[in-house]
């Protein structure tokens, strides 16, 4: 049986990107979905999302007749849209005759319409006019994390920036699992779906495969991106919160190594698990472009956490809330160290100033001593 596993072809120009999907035969769930969302029922469901509806002509004008292309994905092309009021958005258009795209379009409208978090890419509207299926998102001006890790002509991310991105993504997924009601499992966490805004804050994107966690929700065939998919999910076809945790663990190793999960990342990580002295040699797999500018204690903490996340058995993986808390503690320790360094610098400065004051005082005393008349 052919599994609809997404491949992670990196689109260096993507700002909002799906990646290529290999389609197997339609599943029972797909048929149920298609039959349920029809005609007036579909329009009713979309209207209940509460999202603004954009007229097709307005989007056509804002994208210069859909010529300002940013990238291409399984869903269809993505365009940059500049609205008359000055706002800039990313517009994702459903490719014609795309059954998978129709499903993902409805899924994103229904799921993202009720989700709001600073570490998610917000859906700001849609168009479902005369057969057109278009999603309108916030524009992420710095593109995807994958572009920074693998794209040409990009400055390598600093270690501090990589830790911050890990913290941002963890907060976004934690919100999906524990803050949303009902909870949401993303099911396609990967570097191409982590977008960076103008301040380089990371946001989780692409909810076309995501699902709300409900007891009556049917299971589906395995979907996701090769290299990121939970092996337990592949064997059971049952997705859980821990499937997202596994994918996030792969993402952490990506941030550390800048190695593609589809090109031997985990084999490379395996070489570092035991070095000649019988200790974990995480320093050996760090991205060479960092030139050793890495906080070693943070590296070890990050790699150890990633290793727990990618445990083959889901019961041995931490929940996303625990993962997020551990990553936030790294930031607290870093800030504490920075404050301590600043305090020591201030103390050293004060001591230097105090010594200077003493010397000034001694000079003043000497200057105040009257000269003795010559005999």
Question: Each PLM stretch: what is its role?
Answer:
Residues 2-49, 293-375:
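Intrinsically disordered, low-complexity cytosolic regulatory tails
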């Amino acid at each position: 049986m052919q599994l609809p596993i997404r491949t992670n072809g990196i689109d260096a120009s993507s700002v909002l990107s799906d990646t290529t999907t290999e389609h197997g035969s339609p599943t029972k769930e797909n048929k149920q979905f298609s039959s349920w969302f029809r005609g007036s029922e579909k329009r009713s469901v979309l209207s209940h999302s509460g999202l603004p509806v954009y007229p097709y002509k307005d989007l056509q004008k804002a994208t210069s007749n859909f010529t300002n292309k940013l990238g291409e994905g399984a869903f269809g092309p993505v365009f940059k849209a500049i609205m008359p009021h000055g706002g800039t958005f990313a517009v994702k258009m459903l490719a014609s005759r795309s059954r998978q795209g129709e499903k993902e379009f409805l899924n994103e409208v229904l799921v993202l319409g009720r989700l709001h978090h600073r570490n998610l890419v917000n859906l700001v509207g849609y168009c479902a006019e005369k057969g057109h299926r278009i999603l309108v998102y916030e524009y992420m001006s710095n593109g995807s994390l994958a572009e920074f890790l693998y794209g040409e002509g990009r400055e390598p991310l600093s270690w501090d920036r990589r830790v911050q991105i890990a913290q941002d993504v963890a907060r976004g997924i934690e919100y999906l699992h524990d803050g949303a009601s009902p909870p949401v499992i993303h099911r396609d966490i990967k570097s191409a779906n982590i977008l960076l805004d103008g301040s380089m804050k990371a946001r989780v994107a692409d909810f076309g495969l995501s699902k709300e966690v409900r007891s009556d929700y049917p299971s589906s065939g395995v979907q996701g991106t090769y290299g990121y998919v939970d092996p337990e999910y592949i064997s059971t076809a049952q997705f859980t919160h821990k499937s997202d945790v596994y994918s996030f663990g792969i993402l952490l190793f990506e941030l550390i190594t800048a190695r593609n999960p589809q090109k031997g990342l985990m084999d490379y990580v395996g070489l570092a698990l035991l070095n000649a002295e019988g200790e974990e040699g995480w320093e050996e797999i760090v991205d060479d472009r960092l030139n050793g500018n890495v906080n070693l204690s943070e590296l070890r903490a990050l790699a150890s956490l990633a290793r727990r996340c990618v445990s083959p058995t889901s019961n041995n993986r931490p929940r996303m809330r625990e993962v997020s808390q551990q990553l936030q503690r790294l930031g607290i320790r870093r800030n504490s160290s920075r404050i301590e360094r600043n305090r020591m610098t201030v103390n050293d400065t004060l001591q230097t100033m105090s010594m200077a004051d003493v010397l000034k005082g001694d000079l003043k005393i000497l200057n105040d001593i009257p000269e003795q008349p010559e005999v």
